From Swiss-Prot:
Assembly notes: Monomer.
Any one Gene Ontology cellular component term annotated for this protein: cytosol
Protein name, entry field: Translation initiation factor IF-3
Membership in a protein family: Belongs to the IF-3 family.
Taxon lineage: Bacteria, Bacillati, Bacillota, Bacilli, Bacillales
InterPro entries, A to Z: T_IF-3_C_sf, T_IF-3_N_sf, Translation_initiation_fac3_CS, Translation_initiation_fac_3, Translation_initiation_fac_3_C, Translation_initiation_fac_3_N
PROSITE patterns: IF3
Pfam families noted in UniProt: IF3_C, IF3_N
């Protein structure tokens, strides 16, 4: 039989309560039993006695195979982690005076990020006196967003941040 686990689950001899509300391995409620009786019942069917609700009065214990129970829990946790999607933010840097071919190359890269499910931050850095012509940078960003509107939505409109202007694009939700 098992002893106490790292997660401090009370099993078998490590149970501190004198009386337990007992549930059988089939899920049937047996009723309130003493710890000794419950342990004997678990040993008869060669299973463990595990406290599943320690804060209840009296604590709820279940007769089960603890190793199998832990394995099932770990399997569920792995499935939950698989279902979680980590969204990264990728950055594309442009200049206000970008040429058409360079723009198309950066657009292709941004579209690749968006189709993979990542968010895309498109930024323009103004150097020197170029900051006096913010409207040029804004037009470039709006053109970029317009080219991606079939696969992305604008999460944040063009915004200045120091000497940079940026726009945030998020992939559209797949149906």
């Amino acid at each position: 039989m098992s002893t106490i686990a790292k997660d401090q689950t009370q099993i078998n001899d490590k149970i501190r309560a004198k009386e337990l509300r007992l549930i059988s391995q089939d899920g049937e409620q047996i009723g309130v039993k003493s710890k000794r009786e419950a342990l004997e019942m678990a040993e008869r069917v060669d299973l463990d006695l595990v406290v599943v609700a320690p804060n209840a009065k009296p604590p709820v214990a279940r007769i089960m195979d603890y190793g199998k129970f832990k394995f099932e829990q770990q399997k569920k946790e792995k499935e939950m982690k698989k279902k979680q999607k980590i969204i990264n933010v990728k950055e594309i840097r442009l200049s206000p005076t970008i040429e058409e071919h360079d723009f198309q190359t950066k657009l292709k890269n941004g579209r690749k990020f968006l189709t993979k499910g990542d968010k895309c931050k498109v930024s323009i850095r103004f150097r020197g006196r170029a900051i006096t012509h913010k409207e040029i940078g804004q037009r470039v960003l709006e053109k970029y967003a317009d080219e991606c509107k079939d696969i992305a939505t604008v999460e944040q409109k063009p915004k200045m941040d120091g000497r940079q202007m940026f726009i945030m694009l998020a992939p559209t939700a797949e149906k």
